[in-house]
């Protein structure tokens, strides 16, 4: 039996739970929240939907329901408000994360932890410290969504199917994230060359506009509807799918990166091979000097916030 425990039944938690249930990634999904009535209501609603899909058990309960869970997905935390940086949330959500993981560990036997609560890079590092598990068994959602936005934007500009675009956002899931233009390509053809073929100026303004689109996307959504949900929910689903199907897929998840690219003891996103045991390998391919410098700057930002805890 594959059991997934979802901690937090807000927009993100339920978007993930719905996507995971529809994809039938597990036959037992447990919803846990400080608001037990809300969790029960969400489980009842989602269970009704599953009657039209297939035999997926949806239920709610306390932390004791984490027993036997293969994967624990943590989405609970203080809500990001309009205009508020993800890193502004650090102290409040670090405390919440510690409490949640301490409770989970009383019942769960060495699950994989998937972190989504913001600031996700800082809290992924906190989770690794609290749980004491192997580094690859605590995975932050990181820039999986940012990379998807990046690929989608590039695909739209170039007029190609997004599935042929290979491009990564690395570093912090937030304002200091870095676009790896030096590695970006369309089925092996560098984005710079694709732009030239289409008469598009591949200059600093072009690159800054594209990265700005990615960086500001969440703020634009929050400003209009108050929160994000579907994008990050599906990103979490993609990570869990890669684990449960042992895909060895490459995703830009947040993980401890000490020693990679000369970085210190922080967690941030780099392309990682994801399989049944979590993160199997961190891929640190050669990147441009300016990208290396920007990645180091992103790591310093996160290091400062970790030091402030």
From Swiss-Prot:
Substrate binds at residues 80, 86, 118-121, 146-149, 228. Catalyzes the conversion of lactate to pyruvate. GO terms for cellular component: cytoplasm. This is L-lactate dehydrogenase. Pathway: Fermentation; pyruvate fermentation to lactate; (S)-lactate from pyruvate: step 1/1. It comes from the Bacteria. PANTHER family: L-2-HYDROXYCARBOXYLATE DEHYDROGENASE (NAD(P)(+)) (PTHR43128), L-LACTATE DEHYDROGENASE (PTHR43128:SF16). The lineage of its organism: Bacteria, Pseudomonadati, Thermodesulfobacteriota, Desulfovibrionia, Desulfovibrionales. GO terms for biological process: glycolytic process; lactate metabolic process. It comes from Nitratidesulfovibrio vulgaris (strain ATCC 29579 / DSM 644 / CCUG 34227 / NCIMB 8303 / VKM B-1760 / Hildenborough) (Desulfovibrio vulgaris). Keywords: Allosteric enzyme, Cytoplasm, NAD, Oxidoreductase, Phosphoprotein. It holds the Pfam family Ldh_1_C. It catalyses: (S)-lactate + NAD(+) = pyruvate + NADH + H(+). Gene3D superfamilies: Lactate dehydrogenase/glycoside hydrolase, family 4, C-terminal, NAD(P)-binding Rossmann-like Domain.
């Amino acid at each position: 039996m594959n059991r997934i425990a979802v901690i937090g039944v807000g927009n993100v938690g339920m978007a993930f739970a719905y996507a995971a249930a529809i994809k039938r990634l597990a036959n037992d999904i447990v919803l846990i929240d400080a608001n037990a009535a809300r969790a029960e209501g969400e489980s009842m609603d989602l269970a009704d939907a599953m009657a039209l899909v297939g035999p997926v058990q949806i239920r709610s309960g306390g932390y004791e329901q984490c027993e036997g869970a293969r994967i624990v997905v943590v989405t609970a935390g203080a809500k990001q408000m309009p205009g508020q940086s993800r890193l502004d949330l650090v102290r409040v959500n670090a405390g919440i994360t510690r409490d949640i993981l301490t409770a989970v560990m009383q019942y769960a036997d060495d699950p994989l932890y998937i972190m989504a609560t913001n600031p996700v890079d800082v809290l992924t590092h906190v989770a690794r410290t609290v749980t004491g598990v192997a580094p690859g068994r605590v995975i932050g959602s990181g820039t999986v969504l940012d990379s998807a936005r990046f690929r989608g934007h590039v695909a739209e500009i170039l007029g190609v199917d997004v599935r042929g675009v290979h491009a990564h956002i690395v570093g912090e899931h937030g304002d200091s994230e870095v676009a790896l233009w030096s590695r970006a390509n369309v089925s092996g053809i560098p984005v710079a060359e694709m732009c030239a073929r289409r008469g598009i100026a591949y200059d600093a303004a072009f690159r800054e506009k594209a990265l700005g689109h990615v960086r500001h996307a969440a703020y634009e959504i929050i400003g209009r509807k108050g929160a994000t949900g579907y994008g990050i929910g599906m990103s979490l689903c993609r990570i869990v799918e890669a684990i449960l199907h042992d895909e060895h897929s490459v995703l830009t998840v947040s993980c401890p990166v000490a020693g990679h690219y000369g970085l210190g003891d922080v967690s941030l996103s780099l392309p990682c091979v994801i399989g049944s045991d979590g993160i199997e390998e961190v891929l640190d391919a050669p990147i441009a000097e300016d990208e290396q410098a920007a990645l180091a700057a992103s790591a310093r930002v996160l290091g400062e916030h970790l030091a402030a805890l």
